[in-house]
Amino acid sequence: MEVKVLDFNGKDTGRKVQLSDSVFAIEPNNHAVYLDVKQYLANQRQGTHKAKERAEVTGSTRKIKKQKGTGTARAGSVKNPLFKGGGTVFGPRPRSYSFKLNKNLKRLARKSAFSIKAKESNIIVLEDFNFEAPNTKNFINVLKALGLENKKSLFVLGESNKNVYLSSRNLKASNVVTSSELSTYAILNTNNLVLLEGSLELIEENLSK
C-alpha cells in the first residue's frame, strides 16, 4: 500500500512510500495479539502482593478454650482463619506473572497490530525531523500541523533522538519511541500512529525475518 509522506509542518512533500503488504496488510491474528498484549501487561505487574497465613500472624498459640463441653466448635488458636485478625486462607503470595512467547508469534502480533491501524487509516508517515534543542512548544506545533493536538498519538523514530523525546515528554496524549521499543500494546493503545521515514525500513526488516 502507498502512503504519502508529510513534513513536520503537515504539508505533502510530494513523495510516497510503499508499505510492505507482509507487515501492514495481513489478515490480523486476534489470538496472537491477545497473547502479546497479555504478556506485556503481565510483565508490568510487580507481583509483590502478600497476605499473612496462619503461621505468620502475630498472636498467642495458647488454646483459647477447652476441646469439649463448650457446645461450640473446637478452636485451637486466635490465629485461626475463622477469627477476626486471624490468618488468611490461600491468600496472595509474591510471584512473577511473566511468561514467554516465541518470537514468531510476537512478530505476527505486531504485524497484525500494524495491519489493524493501516486498515483504519490511522497511520501517518512523516519526514524525519529534529529540533536544535528540547522544546515542547515546537512539538505541539508539529501536532497542530498534523491535526493531532489533544489526540492520543505515538511517534515512532528510527533511532533515539533526545531532543524530540524530551520535547514530547511533558505531553500526556503523545509518546515517542524508537522502532526497537515498539510493542503490540503501544501500537493498539494509541489513536494515531506516526511513523518517521527512518523507522519504516527498520520495522519492515525486523518483522520480515
UniProtKB/Swiss-Prot annotation:
One of its GO terms (cellular component) is ribonucleoprotein complex. GO terms for molecular function: rRNA binding; structural constituent of ribosome. Belongs to the universal ribosomal protein uL4 family. GO terms for biological process: translation. HAMAP family: Ribosomal_uL4_B (MF_01328_B). Keywords: Ribonucleoprotein, Ribosomal protein, RNA-binding, rRNA-binding. Signal peptide: none annotated. It comes from the Bacteria. NCBIfam families: rplD_bact. It holds the Pfam family Ribosomal_L4. One of the primary rRNA binding proteins, this protein initially binds near the 5'-end of the 23S rRNA. It is important during the early stages of 50S assembly. It makes multiple contacts with different domains of the 23S rRNA in the assembled 50S subunit and ribosome. Forms part of the polypeptide exit tunnel. This is Large ribosomal subunit protein uL4. It comes from Flavobacterium johnsoniae (strain ATCC 17061 / DSM 2064 / JCM 8514 / BCRC 14874 / CCUG 350202 / NBRC 14942 / NCIMB 11054 / UW101). SUPFAM superfamilies: Ribosomal protein L4 (SSF52166). Part of the 50S ribosomal subunit. InterPro entries: Ribosomal_uL4, Ribosomal_uL4-like, Ribosomal_uL4_dom_sf. PANTHER family: 50S RIBOSOMAL PROTEIN L4, LARGE RIBOSOMAL SUBUNIT PROTEIN UL4M. Residues 45-77 are annotated as: Disordered.
